[in-house]
Amino acid sequence: MKIERYFKAIARAFIITFLFSLILQDNGVLARKAKKQDKGAALKSIYDYHVRPYGTVVQSQIAKASPIVDAAKQATVNVKSYYDEHAKPKVENIRYEVNEVIDKKVAPCIKAFNEKARKIGSKVLDGDNLRELYTTGKERIHFFIVDVLIPFFQRVVQEVRTISRDIAEKLQYFWEIHAIPAYHHYKPIIQRGAMDGYMQLRYVFFPAAKATITQMIETSIRFLRTFLDMHIKPQLQHIYESVVEEKSEAFASATSSKILSEMSASMASSSAHYTSSPTILSRTKSVETPVPMEAAEEEPATEYSIPSSVTFNSQNDCFSNAMNYLEHEYETLVSTFTLSVSEHWEDLLRKATDSCQKELEAFEEISNLRVLAVENSLGNLIQKAEESNYDQAIMDLFEYVKDSILRVHERAIKLRTLSDSIRADVAENIEMGINSIREQAAASSEVALAACSGIKHNAEQVNKLNALIQKVYSYITAESEKVGNRYGETLDNVIKQHLSRIGSVASSAVQRLTAVKNSHKLKMVDRSSAELPNFDYLVSDQVHKIVEINDEHADCDDVNFSTASFEIYERSIPTHGADSERKILKRDSLLNEDDEIFNDLNSDKTIKTNQATSTSSSNTQEISYTGTLNDNINEGLSTFPSIDIPASEADNVYSILPIDVSTSEAEGAYSILPIDVPKSVAEETYSFLPSDVPKSEAEKVYSILPIDVPQSVAEETYSFKPSDIPESEAEKIYSILPIDVKDPSLEKDGHVIDSSNLQTDSVKDYSEVSRADNLDASSDTIFSVLHAENEASITKEVHSTPLSDVASSEAEKVYTILPIEVPTDPLPNYSSDVESELTSD
């Protein structure tokens, strides 16, 4: 049955498919035949010629398939009979045997097991046995928990603690020795890589992807248009032409004749229809400007062809019709000119605003990235400079921050030329529109004059026509100036806002860079506490990184502007690679000039501009700077066209707009050093001694002995006269002066005091600090120990002479120490006071 249904479905589908294909293939032929024949005859013809042969084929196929269907039915009957005769008895026998086994063997076993389980349960539930079983189980569980499980868990916990402690120690060692240094090492690399990746995506990948996608879309559109033009349109045109040729030939001929006759009649009848004269008069010559009267007289009339159907009653009628036509056309031009110019201005204004906005966003983003790059690069320079030469570190810091400031300034100056380019584009486009309207009016006038071939000799009529043309010209010019002035004010406001925003962004970037420089400079100076060795081999890596970052972000300045007319001279673009090499060579040459550089860096820096002389080849304006970094900065400066910076703005280099900025504010904002800091504040910041402490107080603090003690008290406390001491004891006096002892007995005792031990450790440390910082102002008060300078002449005369031979006036100045008598009042411990003062400072 299934096979029969399958064949019937195939036959039905085949017949339906055949009928559809037949209809689609021969629809035209059948349609034409169907119009000429009877409906029944057509159906009979279709059945006889198309359906009956296929039906015969289908019947023959069904006849061939009938034996196969019968054989399948017989095979089904044979299989069923075989199952009933052979397989079914065996299945029944196996089922009977399984039931016998379950009833005779499995059931008694289950019954015996249930009985045995019942007996065991009743025995266990007996009172004595249950208590004994409970006690035994409890003892065994207690023994297992106390003697086995708890010790095992204790050992496991101890092992886990030991292993955890070892792991924690190893992790801590790894974290402190490897992880943290690796983090500090790779952090700037990753930051720079991320920044580079962002710049690549923003200015390389995205523009390339946009260009590629645009090209793909344009290619696809071009391919579709080509396919339509080459394949679809010819077919449609062919179908249209065949239909028109077959059915509408007579109608088209009649319509064309009627249209041509009506156009000719309207041209010759009245002047009201001359508004459509450009469709009747065909020019063979194009003139760009209005033709004077003399040129019109020389121009042959044969260059313009007038249809033969057009006739004029007289030259006056022709001229009247031409004047009416020109007046109507001029009125149309005048009425639509204001609207077209306004729309053009609005479009240009919108484009200018978008261009300014895009340039501002790009400029602000690049400025922020440059500041971020400087901050990230100079952060590591502070750590490296703790073991390096601070003079050269500050020098490099100022130099590269100054380079970044100059690059921001260069970018701002380039953006300023956008205003001039936008104005030029607007003026050019408006002028082109006005010229186009003038050419159209002039062409219409020439056509009218040429149509009336004899009117060119009538000077009065020609003057009327010229007066009309001049009236239209004057109106167009006045209206264009009026619209231009109105929209020009709006454009000027947009450009002023644009330049104001550029100035604020550039000033903000410069101030941020200056703040970064000042902050790092103060940190570096505050951390410098002693004279350190040459640091070139330590800081050169960081300097090189700063140079690389400046080079990488200098590529951002080469991004194309959105305004097509914006151009910058090649001679004004600095070659930063060569500048970096010159700066590195200059830094190497300045390593041996530490003192001079350090003094110059702490002096005031001023920024000035000089306008160079204009030459015939190029007008340039050169920016010059004065100060310690003059040589390094001038090498990296570029020149810009004089049109970029007006003369009124040349006095202020960093002024983007002609705004009123005082000289003091400009110096405070863009100076390399904080020159607005008072001298007293600077001394407190960079000096290690409080400059406001009086000299007397400083002597008390840093002097070893209290020099303000009265002389009488000092003589009683610290001096001993020879008359109070026996001569035998006087010879054994241990003099504190650094004298050359010649007495053998004194040399044997070994009590001669070395002069190098006169100063305490704190005084030595402080002297090293003061010597390292070149504190000349406080050196007189620090090294006033025992009046060493005053007693220099005495030490030359004393040598090993006994104290009794020394004059009493000189002996009073000598502070001696006796081993036999100690003053009741001990000396004040000024060394500890000195150490505490030094620590607090």
From Swiss-Prot:
Q: What is its main location?
A: secreted
Q: Any idea which UniProt keywords this protein has?
A: Secreted, Signal
- UniProt superkingdom: Eukaryota
**Compartments reported by the entry:** Secreted
GO cellular component labels: cell surface; extracellular region
Q: Where is the signal peptide?
A: 1-31
The entry's protein name is Uncharacterized protein C21C3.14c
Q: What is the lineage of its organism?
A: Eukaryota, Fungi, Dikarya, Ascomycota, Taphrinomycotina
